[in-house]
Swiss-Prot record:
One of its GO terms (cellular component) is cytosol. It holds the Pfam family HSP70. InterPro entries: ATPase_NBD (IPR043129), HSP70_C_sf (IPR029048), HSP70_peptide-bd_sf (IPR029047), Hsp_70_fam (IPR013126). This is Heat shock protein homolog SSE1. Its main location: cytoplasm. GO terms for molecular function: ATP binding; ATP-dependent protein folding chaperone. Belongs to the heat shock protein 70 family.
Length: 693
């Protein structure tokens, strides 16, 4: 049975949660952090994923790729690419399919990876973290992504999960996942005919800002509106601080960090810390040692100065809120509560602006960093066939209208708007077309002008085959089950022909009919399913052959990472054994080895040490094991003698302690018997006494 796994795929860091023990738990990583850096680094032999990649980011800056969720499914020629590219220190390139990829130096040569591959590497890493922490089987996952993700980006994330060995049961909007977390754990929601509670969720993370308004009743929620600014987040504040100090240090210290990626990265990391400090303090010092050219830099920044630096950003705070309210047809007064989510909402100026926009105090019922992951884990649990969870129904909404079109044959129309903007999903619509033979269908966004700049209106295409028209007929009715699935993906779930047949139907007898009345029948026409048709889908999903090739590649890279880690462990074990054994040989092991054994073992240790720091510095796992076992063949004999003597001492001490206890017990028993004897004698003397006059 798979443990339900929820992943809040963040731009700067990601949070993992699982459903277990009748609750939702956050997974800590290998260094006990409750979030894991969202990046992938490449080295001479292996990859550095998550925490290890973050630790090496500054020294390995050109071969470390972060901001992964921003380039998944993104065209190199998309208008967003120019804006995104400034956040990357690694080299981004245009792939053969027109998508964005990253070029890095890995295993001694230049290699290029697609954004989907990079996301898969990271997802595989966090899956491994979850498996190690839970010690269970994890195959199903619900992944939280931005509400503005297109159909193509959702397919790309789903493919990345599959490459990582997971089954993506749902790609869910991140703020919707937070709303689910709110609805599941709130115990005071209205019921029955009571008015729903309207809650606005404002999520400002590392790179994006979303406002979602939802209506709640006990056991259910309905998303009323979602609006966003996909280029507004904590990284913009970090960059504003960094650019400010870049100008200052150019004048003050005559250095230009913009010309040195490592220096810029160090100032950027320090700027992120300063931003957090200024959320709790009105001013703070800023210093970084040896930034570049052996120059130490220092300065300070006040909260007021920061707000002035980011004033263009602050002027955009209310726009998503205004749009969401208009979309939901609500006034700020009609919103009952405003919940804030995401680390960037801790910035005081943002909190004040959000509060003023709604005209009410902000609520912090949810854990700002973990609510999305917990909601995603619960959603994954809903899909589990073996896990029972409390009933909870939720619906998201289509941000844009979607129409289906088909080859024009018998009908006057050749298209239909099936899922209007603002309608709920998941949902299914059944349509009937008169067809003369096999045909094609397409799904497109109805109004291209409503889409974000650069977004393609194309969604998917399907070929429907197997249509057979009966002799004497010119066409046949075809029913199509059109569906927007729980992940917001548009599919044709079923397609089949129908025909009308004549059947005899029993006529109900009148209430006063005699018991022996003969049954009456009438002939009626019924429409029944005739032939199931073949649906060949052409979507943004990877084709099976390409997907399998990427799965195989990821498995190879994972095996190599594992081998490198195990090799390093064996090398460290050998080094530790050399130092430990050498020290003990002159101390606690001294009396348990002959002079000849000491001399021989010290020579072996010296040779092993010389080898380890020379030709063995970069050797293979098997050689480290062989060297270790060679030393252990004699070292363990000496150690065995020492342990045997120690055990002998312990046994002697234990025997002595037991003898002491037995003697003490015997002494107590003797004293007890003596006391009882004296008591009896005293009683006998008392009974024998006779009083004489």
């Amino acid at each position: 049975m798979s443990i339900p796994f929820g992943l809040d795929l963040g731009n700067n860091s990601s949070v993992l949660a699982v459903a277990r023990n009748r609750g939702i738990d956050i997974i800590v990583n290998e260094v006990s952090n409750r979030s894991t850096p969202s990046l992938v680094g490449f080295g001479q032999k292996n990859r550095f994923l998550g925490e290890s990649g973050k630790n090496k980011q500054t020294s390995n800056i050109k071969n470390t790729v972060d901001n992964l969720k921003r380039i998944v499914g993104l065209d190199y020629d998309h208008p967003d690419f120019e804006q995104e590219s400034k956040y990357f220190s690694s080299k981004l390139v245009k792939l053969d399919d027109g998508k964005v990829g990253a070029q890095v130096r890995f295993a001694g040569k230049q290699q290029t990876f697609s954004a989907t591959q990079l996301a898969a590497m990271y997802i595989n890493k966090v899956k491994t973290t979850a498996v190690q922490e839970t010690k269970g089987n994890i195959t199903d996952v619900a992944i939280a992504v931005p509400a503005w993700y297109t159909e193509e980006q959702r397919y790309s994330i789903g493919d990345a999960a599959k490459i990582a060995g997971l089954n993506p049961v749902r790609i869910v909007n991140d703020v919707t996942a937070a709303a689910v977390s709110y609805g599941v754990f709130k115990t005071d929601l209205p019921e029955g005919e009571e008015k729903p509670r309207v809650v606005a969720f404002v999520d400002i993370g590392h790179s994006t800002y979303t406002c979602t308004i939802a209506a709640f009743k006990k056991g259910e929620l309905k998303v009323l509106a979602t609006a966003y600014d996909k280029h507004f987040g904590g990284r913009d504040f970090d960059r504003a601080i960094t650019e400010h100090f870049a100008d200052e240090f150019k004048t003050k210290y005559k250095i230009d960090i913009r010309e040195n990626p490592k220096a810029y990265s160090r100032i950027l990391a320090a700027a992120e810390k300063l931003k957090k400090v200024l959320s709790a303090n009105t001013a703070a010092p800023f210093s970084v040692e040896s930034v570049m050219n052996d120059v130490d830099v220092s300065s300070q920044l006040s909260r007021e100065e920061l707000e002035e630096l980011v004033s263009p950003l602050l002027s955009r705070v209310t726009e998503p809120i205004t749009k969401a309210l208009a979309q939901a047809n609500l006034t700020p007064e009609e919103v009952d509560y405003v919940e804030i989510v995401g680390g960037t909402t801790r910035i005081p100026s943002l909190k004040n602006a959000i509060s003023e926009a709604f005209g009410k105090q902000l609520s912090t019922t949810l854990n700002q960093d973990e609510a999305i992951a917990k909601g995603a884990a619960f959603i994954c649990a809903i899909h589990s066939p073996t896990l029972r969870v409390r009933p909870f129904k939720f619906e998201d909404i289509h941000p844009y209208s979607v129409s289906y079109s088909w080859d024009k044959q018998e009908e006057d129309e050749d298209h239909l708007e099936v899922f209007p903007a603002g309608s709920s999903y998941p949902s299914t619509k059944l349509i009937t077309l008169q067809r003369t033979g096999d045909f094609s269908m397409q799904a497109k966004y109805t109004n291209k002008e409503e889409l974000p700049e650069g977004t393609s209106a194309e969604i998917a295409k399907w070929d429907i085959t197997g249509v057979q028209v009966s002799e004497g007929e010119t066409s046949v009715p075809v029913k199509l089950k059109l569906r927007c699935d729980p992940s917001g993906l548009h599919i044709i779930e079923d397609a089949y022909t129908v025909e009308d047949i004549k059947v005899q139907e029993l006529v109900p007898l009148p209430a006063d009919a005699p018991e022996d009345a003969e049954p009456e029948y009438r002939e009626v026409t019924k429409t029944v399913k005739k032939d199931t048709l073949t649906i060949i889908a052409h979507t943004f999903a990877l084709e099976e052959k390409a997907l399998n090739a990427l799965i195989e590649k990821e498995n190879e890279l994972s095996a190599q990472d594992k081998l490198v880690a195990e090799t390093e462990d064996r090398k460290n074990a050998l080094e530790e054994y050399i130092y430990t054994l050498r020290g003990k040989l002159d101390e606690e092991y001294s009396d348990f080895a002959s002079d000849d054994e000491k001399t021989r073992l010290k020579e072996m240790l010296a040779k092993a040490e010389d080898w380890l720091y020379d030709e063995g510095y970069d050797s293979i796992k098997a050689k480290y094991i062989a060297k270790y076992e060679e030393l252990a063949s004699l070292g363990n004999i000496i150690r065995g003698r020492y342990l045997a003597k120690e055990e002998e001492k312990r046994q002697a001490l234990r025997s002595k302690q037991e003898a002491s206890k037995m003697a003490e017990l015997a002494e107590k028993l003797a004293a007890q018997r003596k006391a009882e004897s004296e008591k009896k004698e005293s009683k006998a003397d008392a009974e024998g006494d006779v009083e004489l006059d």
